[in-house]
Amino acid sequence: MTSIIKLTTLVGAQEESAVCYLLQVDEFRFLLDCGWDENFSMDIIDSVKKYVHQVDAVLLSHPDPLHLGALPYAVGKLGLNCAIYATIPVYKMGQMFMYDLYQSRHNTEDFSLFSLDDVDCAFDKIQQLKYNQIVHLKGKGHGLSITPLPAGHMIGGTIWKIVKDGEEEIVYAVDFNHKREIHLNGCSLEMINRPSLLITDSFNATYVQPRRKQRDEQLLTNVLETLRGDGNVLIAVDTAGRVLELAQLLDQIWRTKDAGLGVYSLALLNNVSYNVVEFSKSQVEWMSDKLMRCFEDKRNNPFQFRHLTLCHGYSDLARVPSPKVVLASQPDLECGFSRELFIQWCQDPKNSVILTYRTTPGTLARFLIDHPSERIIDIELRKRVKLEGKELEEYVEKEKLKKEAAKKLEQSKEADLDSSDDSDVEEDIDQITSHKAKHDLMMKNEGSRKGSFFKQAKKSYPMFPAPEDRIKWDEYGEIIKPEDFLVPELQVTEDEKTKLESGLTNGDEPMDQDLSDVPTKCVSTTESMEIKARVTYIDYEGRSDGDSIKKIINQMKPRQLIIVHGPPDATQDLAEACRAFGGKDIKVYTPKLHETVDATSETHIYQVRLKDSLVSSLKFCKAKDTELAWIDGVLDMRVSKVDTGVILEERELKDEGEDMEMQVDTQVMDASTIAQQKVIKSLFGDDDKEFSEESEIIPTLEPLPSNEVPGHQSVFMNEPRLSDFKQVLLREGIHAEFVGGVLVCNNMVAVRRTETGRIGLEGCLCEDFFKIRELLYEQYAIV
């Protein structure tokens, strides 16, 4: 590679967790995904926090929380402020994921890590792209381009291709699926040939995946047996990703008369179910060819479900007759409707629970998958209840004090506003009278006439007192007081109003009362529960299996491979398989957590800082699209707080900028420099956190004194072709023609290419010889 490429694993290395990586390409830093696990581990936030202000762009691959869950927190709390790129479905469905996740947590606990406003603020920064749309970055990212390609895992799921200067190709492909499904086409990774670097995951490297037909039959059998036994089926799914595949599959099964399921109910239960289906209807062009043909030929939207009932809460679900199949979020059973239904239904042997997703280890769903024989578990029961008794009275008193304080503050502001308005009016009147006094044109006679001897009779006009009330205005116009528009019969007294606000009304409570309108608190208890219902894991994750992953990597033949996101044994298995079929042609890296991989293959490329005095003394010569200069300098090693930097070794230096390449002739301080490096490494190594976050050893190139500058032979670059040089000679009026591969000029000078590939000039020392030599020199960049 001709660029500096580094990858730092912030989250998701040698483990099954969220994914988040920092990719450095020269001076530009990408944050590849920004995921958060189901338990909202703050270790993930601490890892992201160290680098959040260095990030220049964020690339999101999938819409689920494991790929973008930490984005609202990073934007709202950590100050992440950069361009964020994602496909249109990832933008829309990602919002649905985060809305549902927040509401699921908020319904049963005091959740304050991020708010819905943080979600909106984060997603407002996203630049929405289409598949195969090439985006050329600007500024620090000049020369870089990014392209989203279909991943086949979720709607809008992306494989990112990053290209540097049309040469180096970096492919970021995690959680991809090459198989065609009902609602999605598979990815086409094999079309990418010989990338410089491939970053992929090993989540399924050792997983043996059953055939799709076998999984569908298992699902249908489970559902039929449970429903015919008068039981309910809970299918734990995500919010807006893989749930679309299951919804399509089940709705098609329900349409089939032979299945005999038409008499049973099918429901989708999450906080944003209606929005998810509506967004899906408008994104058919992102889905499989089969669904698109159905939509184009029959003009029938595939997400206009016939049998699937959309529910937003338990009251909606209660109206769906039993027995029923319920697709409920979240897939981890840690929160949301799926957890509540699991607690209600798991103690009835008639019911069935189907898990479709291997979530992070430590979650309830993953525990049930890994320990299918465990029938007694301790589970935390969380719920939000209304305040009662003393707690309610204290809450009402606090709210009353808050309202009084807010009212006083508002009144003081209004008083200040009135006084300022009155003073403005007085100033205006004073200004008018002063202007009248100064004005000497169009003066009436009464104003200048002196009083006469006889009293003049004045005509008086009777008037009623008319005090003028000043109307309050703000940015939106006149301020409206709601009490002015109340109907007298509907007005309530202050006591009744207080009772209504505090929830102390007489009579029965409504069955589906919204707890957000009354004061509540969250309570939790731990109970031991016996699982009597049938719990089954059926794989509908939508990922490629281990053998397919290995075949795809073998077809791509990447020069370098970085394996992330997977258990240690799966990571090692995939690495060994890739080394076996790739041999010496592939470098395989298996980084650990918080480890940085240097994927720069050219070992003579380094980053150095140039002194201004050195840059001002350089003499550049143009060579094609670049400018070259010879540098004579001395290296100074020191610790400096900068964003980038590389420890210099005793090798040739070559600094490549945006528009120039510099060939460096350096005098490296042999023993002293190496010793200094070792001392600095020992003093400010990885153990010292004060310097390990941003500080690195930066080689600074300083100019040599003029009396110490060594001479050097001229370097000829940009070798011309003889055919092109012939055209140059003809334009200058010199007759030139090829004779036996030798360019003969005016029958006096011969220009030939030697066996070593260099151009030689032969002939008598005449005026033509020196003119032709000068023209030949002009074709080179001489440094």
UniProtKB/Swiss-Prot annotation:
Subcellular location: Nucleus; Cytoplasm
UniProt cross-references to Pfam families, sorted A to Z: Beta-Casp (PF10996), CPSF100_C (PF13299), Lactamase_B_6 (PF16661), RMMBL (PF07521)
GO CC list: cytoplasm; mRNA cleavage and polyadenylation specificity factor complex
GO biological process: mRNA 3'-end processing by stem-loop binding and cleavage
Swiss-Prot/TrEMBL keywords: Cytoplasm, mRNA processing, Nucleus, RNA-binding
Comp. bias (Basic and acidic residues): 407-416
Keyword RNA-binding belongs to the record: yes
Biased composition (Acidic residues): 417-427
GO molecular function annotations of the record: RNA binding
Gene3D superfamilies from the UniProt entry: Ribonuclease Z/Hydroxyacylglutathione hydrolase-like (3.60.15.10)
Region (Disordered): 407-427
Primary residence: nucleus
PANTHER family documented for this protein: CLEAVAGE AND POLYADENYLATION SPECIFICITY FACTOR SUBUNIT 2
Its job: CPSF plays a key role in pre-mRNA 3'-end formation, recognizing the AAUAAA signal sequence and interacting with poly(A) polymerase and other factors to bring about cleavage and poly(A) addition. In X.laevis this subunit seems to be predominantly involved in cytoplasmic polyadenylation reaction. May also be involved in the histone 3'-end pre-mRNA processing.
Subunit structure, as described in the record: CPSF is a heterotetramer composed of four distinct subunits 160, 100, 70 and 30 kDa. Identification in a complex with cpsf2, cpsf73, cpsf160 and sympk. Interacts with sympk.
Family: Belongs to the metallo-beta-lactamase superfamily. RNA-metabolizing metallo-beta-lactamase-like family. CPSF2/YSH1 subfamily.
Protein's name in the database: Cleavage and polyadenylation specificity factor subunit 2
